[in-house]
């Protein structure tokens, strides 16, 4: 199976299945001499791990990261870093009924058509369980960014809409994000979303969400025209996350409704020999290259396909069947997509920063 790696200079390859003994990744391109321990990975992994509230899957996993290589006495050596996360709470019997049936909305059918074989236990390789190792790789990417830039680069995400109920942007407060089970920047939306998901769970159904990712402190100049544009790589990274069906950068699809004079971000002297922008419809990227403004991306996450409501499908013999997905599933998988989205943005930025350094030296201002 191809397509298991992401990145160019900063590159990671993931492996493992949802109900296998472990999942993991191998991260390449990390410069030597960067302080790194398993604890650096664990903070982000703990934000993503399941079973932390009634609004996520009740599968219990510690998601404890083990660094197997590439680090000596707490410092990176420049060699590949292997990270292992053991699976400890699999319940494969929950999937015995669908071993020969294709679940609507899942990758069951497409994996079967392509490979002629699939692992039905929890979705196997296509499960969102794989995203844990993306978060581990993203934590390493954050360390690379800080080391190369000589300063922190802030990457944060939040759920801005769930089940059609959107936040009030005037209430945006980053301090609220980690203070509630929804990663909501609007504390006033916690109660409505609780009521929404409680009802969805009772119905045996699910809802989708919109996640917004913001990267602040990105230096200008990251990105490679024409086919390795920064925004194109960000879109690919975010679209590769399970259940994501759409990505927009900056104003995104709203830009199609604007006139030219409203959409193009005007520039003025910043008094320091550079420029400042009067708006940020571009989302921090022009011509595929970062402008130095805040990078803003949004991703649409579809409703979890594993639901208790019977749906029509076919089995591996082409016969009509009804499918009900048992097991422990997220009523809104968009919640736990927040740290995953942050991680993928970190990976892209680390990759492009190393590529910039290799071609041009350090970015302007560093």
UniProtKB/Swiss-Prot annotation:
Catalytic reaction(s) noted: 5-O-(1-carboxyvinyl)-3-phosphoshikimate = chorismate + phosphate
Positions contributing to FMN binding: 125-127, 242-243, 287, 302-306, 328
Pathway: Metabolic intermediate biosynthesis; chorismate biosynthesis; chorismate from D-erythrose 4-phosphate and phosphoenolpyruvate: step 7/7
Record keyword Membrane present: no
Biological processes annotated in GO: amino acid biosynthetic process; aromatic amino acid family biosynthetic process; chorismate biosynthetic process
Subunit structure: Homotetramer.
Protein name: Chorismate synthase
GN (gene name): aroC
């Amino acid at each position: 199976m191809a397509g298991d790696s992401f990145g160019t200079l900063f590159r990671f390859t993931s492996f493992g299945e949802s109900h296998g003994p472990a999942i993991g990744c191998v991260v390449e391109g990390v410069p030597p001499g960067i302080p790194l321990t398993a604890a650096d990975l664990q903070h982000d992994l703990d934000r993503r791990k399941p079973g932390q509230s009634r609004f996520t899957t009740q599968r219990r996993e510690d998601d404890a990261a083990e660094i197997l290589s590439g680090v000596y006495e707490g410092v990176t050596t420049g060699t590949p870093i292997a990270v292992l996360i053991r699976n400890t709470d699999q319940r494969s019997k929950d999937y015995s009924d669908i071993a020969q049936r294709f679940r609507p909305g899942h990758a069951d059918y497409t994996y079967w058509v392509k490979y002629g074989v699939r692992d039905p236990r929890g979705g196997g390789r296509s499960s969102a369980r794989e995203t844990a190792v993306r978060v581990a790789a993203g934590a390493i990417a954050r360390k690379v960014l800080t080391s190369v830039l000589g300063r922190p680069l802030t990457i944060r995400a939040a759920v801005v809409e769930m089940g059609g109920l959107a936040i009030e942007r005037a209430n945006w407060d980053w301090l609220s994000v980690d203070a509630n089970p929804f990663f909501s920047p609007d504390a006033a939306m916690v109660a409505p979303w609780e009521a929404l998901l409680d009802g969805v769970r009772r119905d045996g159904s699910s809802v989708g969400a919109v996640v917004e990712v913001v990267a602040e402190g990105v230096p200008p100049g990251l990105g490679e025209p024409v086919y390795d544009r920064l925004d194109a790589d960000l879109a690919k990274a975010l679209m590769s996350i399970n259940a994501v069906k759409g990505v927009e950068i900056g104003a995104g699809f709203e830009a199609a409704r604007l006139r030219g004079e409203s959409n193009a971000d005007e520039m003025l002297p910043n008094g320091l020999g550079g420029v400042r922008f009067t708006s940020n419809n571009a989302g921090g990227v022009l011509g595929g290259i970062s402008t130095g403004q805040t990078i803003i991306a949004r991703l649409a996450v579809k409703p979890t396909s594993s639901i208790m409501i019977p749906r029509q499908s076919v089995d591996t013999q082409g016969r009509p069947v009804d499918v009900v997905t048992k097991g422990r599933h997220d009523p809104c998988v968009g919640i736990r997509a927040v740290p995953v989205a942050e991680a993928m943005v970190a990976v892209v930025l680390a990759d492009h920063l190393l590529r910039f350094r290799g071609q041009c030296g350090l970015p302007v201002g560093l």
